[in-house]
Amino acid sequence: MGDSENVQQPSKKRGALKQLSRDNPGLDDDDDSAELESGTFKKASDEVLASRRIVRVKRKEPSAAPVAASNPFAGIQLVPTTAPASTPVGTNAPLAESKLAPAEAVVEDNQKASDIEEGDEVDSKKVDVKDAVGEETEKTKDKDDNHCGKSADVQVAATEVAQMVSCDTNVCNNAVEGTDQTDFPLEKDSGGDQAEKKEKEGNGIEEADKNGDNGAFSSFQQHSSNKNAFTGLASTEASGSSFSFGLVSQDGSTGTGSLFGFGLPSSNSSSIFGATGSSIIKKSEGSGFPPKQEVSTETGEENEKVAFSADSIMFEYLDGGWKERGKGELKVNVSSNDGKARLVMRAKGNYRLILNASLYPEMKLANMDKKGITFACVNSVSEGKEGLSTFALKFKDPTIVEEFRVAIDKHKDSKPMEKAAEKSALPLKTPENSPTATDT
């Protein structure tokens, strides 16, 4: 028990005696605060207050209805008016005068320390408020003045641009009219010449309306006599062939030619490629691809009848193992001329010949895994090999294997025996029945 009493408790970390904060950043503020609390504030005397001037600033209350923002593009006119502008170009709107009176300084007297401190605090606050309000009003006035100046500048620039555009259009129209008549520089025309030009333009528009051409093509058609919409400004009928989107005929109907091509001139002048239009047409008519000639392919099976046909896979026994040779259609063909039979197999897809073997009487067939059958034959397709080779065929169904066996057994002995018998039945050629010299 004594040991437990002697055990000391773990000591706590020593904490600060006073908590520092923003209101109490230092440790020596207690003395100052005590002094401030003990003292009392004194009001300045009436004479001092009378000598001071207290200024009270009140802000203007904004109106309930907001003023609509002025449109800076309201004065822009794309089409220039005939009457000159009433206001001169260089004048700007006068600046609005300020309504608030300038800030006035507060007069202070060097008197008692308590009165000076109290007056300084009150006056500094009032002056700061007044200066802030004055700066805000000046900024708003500057913004309004800049806005008015910018709108006036925009209007002036718009009128100048419109006048320049109208002048440019007039100059372009005069230049276009001059290209059809003369190649000399433009000169000022008299009143009579202008009247004649207007009459000519009116006659041209009436003729275009009679021919059925709308106004959209008139601006392009006045530059050339052949009414080609997309040719040069000074193109004529005597010029060479050029690229166009089709020619408009005089009667208003389009031609039968291609809309997108090289237009051929009406005269016999030389074209771009050094040949006339008629020769080009003749060459295009004569240049045609010859018809494809059908090539007859002979497989050698034209004079044969198919006795058996089925799909199978062929294997060849080489070096102690079976190697696949291909997949395709196996046929037993019998010649219609001499009655001989042979095995023919072609690969599927490219019809490559992979088996061509004649049947012989000693040919033996052996079953292999129900769906397969083996035999020995001489394959004429395999080059460089002489003698018999062992092949195996695998079919899809065992019944096909039996059909193949029956077909082989039936035609492997098919030698020209019947024809030999027919030949033997013919009468022998003897001196009696032999042809004479007179017969030949």
Curated annotation (Swiss-Prot):
Q: Which residues carry this modification: Phosphothreonine?
A: 430
Q: Mind listing the GO biological process terms from this record?
A: intracellular transport; mRNA transport; protein transport
Source organism = Arabidopsis thaliana (Mouse-ear cress)
Check the record and name the InterPro entries matching this protein: NUP2/50/61, PH-like_dom_sf, Ran_bind_dom, RanBD_NUP50_plant, RanBP1-like
Q: Where is the composition biased (Polar residues)?
A: 1-10, 431-440
Name the UniProt key words of this record, in alphabetical order.
Acetylation, mRNA transport, Nuclear pore complex, Nucleus, Phosphoprotein, Protein transport, Repeat, Translocation, Transport
Matching entries from PANTHER family are given as: RAN BINDING PROTEIN (PTHR23138), RAN-BINDING PROTEIN 3B-RELATED (PTHR23138:SF142)
Q: Which residues carry this modification: N-acetylglycine?
A: 2
- The record's disulfide annotation reads none
Protein name, UniProt field: Nuclear pore complex protein NUP50A
Q: What is known of its domains?
A: Contains FG repeats mediating the translocation through the NPC by interacting with transport factors.
Q: Where in the cell is it found?
A: Nucleus, Nucleoplasm; Nucleus, Nuclear pore complex
User: Per the record, where are the segments of Acidic residues compositional bias?
Assistant: 26-35
Which residues form the sequence repeats? 245-246, 260-261, 262-263, 273-274
According to the record, the residues making up region (4 X 2 AA repeats of F-G) are 245-274
Chain ranges passing through the membrane: none
Q: Which CDD domains match?
A: RanBD_NUP50_plant (cd13169)
| Protein's gene | NUP50A
Q: Where is the composition biased (Basic and acidic residues)?
A: 122-150, 185-212, 412-422
From the UniProt entry, list the residue stretches annotated as the region Disordered. Answer: 1-39, 102-150, 174-222, 283-303, 412-440
Report the function annotation for this chain: Probably involved in nucleocytoplasmic transport via its interactions with importins and Ran, rather than by forming part of the nuclear pore complex (NPC) scaffolding.
